[in-house]
Design a protein with these regions (language model features):
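Short, flexible loop segments at boundaries between secondary-structure elements
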Residues: 136-164
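Residues at the C-termini of beta-strands that transition into short coil/loop
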Residues: 77-79, 153-155, 171
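Conserved beta-strand scaffold positions in the cores of enzyme catalytic domains, especially
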Residues: 73-75, 149-151, 167
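A conserved mid-domain beta-alpha-beta active-site/ligand-binding segment of alpha/beta enzyme cores
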Residues: 158-216
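C-terminal accessory region of SF2 helicases/translocases
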Residues: 234-236
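Active-site beta-strand->loop->alpha-helix modules in alpha/beta enzyme cores, enriched
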Residues: 1-145, 183-184, 198-205, 212-219, ...
C-alpha cells in the first residue's frame, strides 16, 4: 500500500481537513494517534489505513491525468508490506496468489515492473520477487506465451547502455507530461521518507536519468531526442 512512505504531517493535514468538514470519531482518533506518536512508536491501524488511502488517491490522480479509466487501475495490497514498519514480512504464498490472480484475470500481452533494486528500503525488490515467483507458476498457461515482461528503472540507477533492450524516445511535451503525472504523488516529493543518498527530487532524478539515456544514444551516433525511457526484457 505504500503507507509507511507517507509522513505524519501529510496524514495529519488530510485528517484535519476531513474533520473540519464534519465531526468524525474516526478522524478525531487519527488526529489523536498522530499527536501522541513518539519517534519510537509505530502507526496505528487507522493511521496506516489513512496513509494507504492517500497513496491510492495520488495514484488515481496520476492515472486519470494520463487518461486511464479508474476501473482499469488495480491495487494489489500485498500482505508482506503491511507490518507498519520499515522491516517487512517475508514474501508468502498469499502474496504470490494475489499476483497470480491479477495476471490470470487480465491476461496481459505486456507487463511493466520496477527493476529498482537500489530502492533504499527494498520494497521494489520484494515486489519484483513476487512477480518473478508468479511468472514461474503461470508460465505454462497458454496466454503467457504472448506475454512479455519489461523492467524499468525509477528514481535510482538506470540500466547500463549494453543492457537496454527497448528504448522509447520522448518528446519535450512527453517529458513534461511525465513530470506532471509524478507531481500527483504529492506525499512523495518535497523531502520524502525514504530519499536515499541522492537529495534531488524524484521527478528531477527521473528526468535527468531519461535525458542522460538519450544523450548516450546520441553519442553513439543515433537520433537526438529530449529523453528516452529504457527497458530490459525479463525472460521466464
Amino acid at each position: 500500500s505504500g503507507n509507511i512512505a507517507v509522513a505524519d504531517h501529510e496524514a495529519l493535514k488530510v485528517a484535519e481537513v476531513a474533520q473540519s468538514m464534519g465531526e468524525s470519531n474516526m478522524f478525531k482518533q487519527i488526529i489523536q494517534d498522530i499527536g501522541q506518536k513518539t519517534t519510537e512508536d509505530y502507526d496505528s491501524s487507522l493511521v496506516r489505513k489513512l496513509k494507504g488511502t492517500i497513496r491510492r488517491a495520488e495514484s488515481i490522480g496520476a492515472t486519470r491525468y494520463m487518461g486511464i479509466p479508474d476501473d482499469q487501475v488495480h491495487f494489489l495490497d500485498l500482505p508482506f508490506y503491511e507490518t507498519g514498519t520499515i522491516k517487512k514480512n517475508p514474501l508468502g504464498p498469499e502474496d504470490i496468489a494475489i499476483m497470480n490472480q491479477i495476471i490470470e484475470t487480465i491476461k496481459p500481452h505486456q507487463i511493466y515492473a520496477a527493476g529498482d533494486l537500489a530502492d533504499p528500503h527494498g520494497t521494489h525488490r520484494v515486489c519484483l520477487e513476487a512477480l518473478f515467483a508468479s511468472l514461474e507458476e503461470l508460465k505454462k498457461k497458454p496466454f503467457m506465451k504472448a506475454c512479455w515482461v519489461w523492467l524499468y528503472r525509477g528514481a535510482w540507477h538506470e540500466w547500463d547502455i549494453h543492457e537496454i533492450e527497448m528504448a522509447v524516445p520522448m518528446s519535450p511535451e512527453q517529458v513534461l507530461r511525465k513530470r506532471k503525472a509524478i507531481f500527483y504523488h504529492q506525499t512523495q516529493k518535497d523531502g520524502v521518507m525514504f530519499q536515499g543518498e541522492d537529495l534531488r527530487e524524484f521527478w528531477v532524478r527521473a528526468e535527468d536519468r531519461n535525458k542522460d539515456t538519450a544523450l548516450k544514444y546520441q553519442k553513439l551516433g543515433l537520433a537526438s531526442y529530449a529523453a528516452m525511457e529504457a527497458f530490459v526484457k525479463y525472460d521466464f
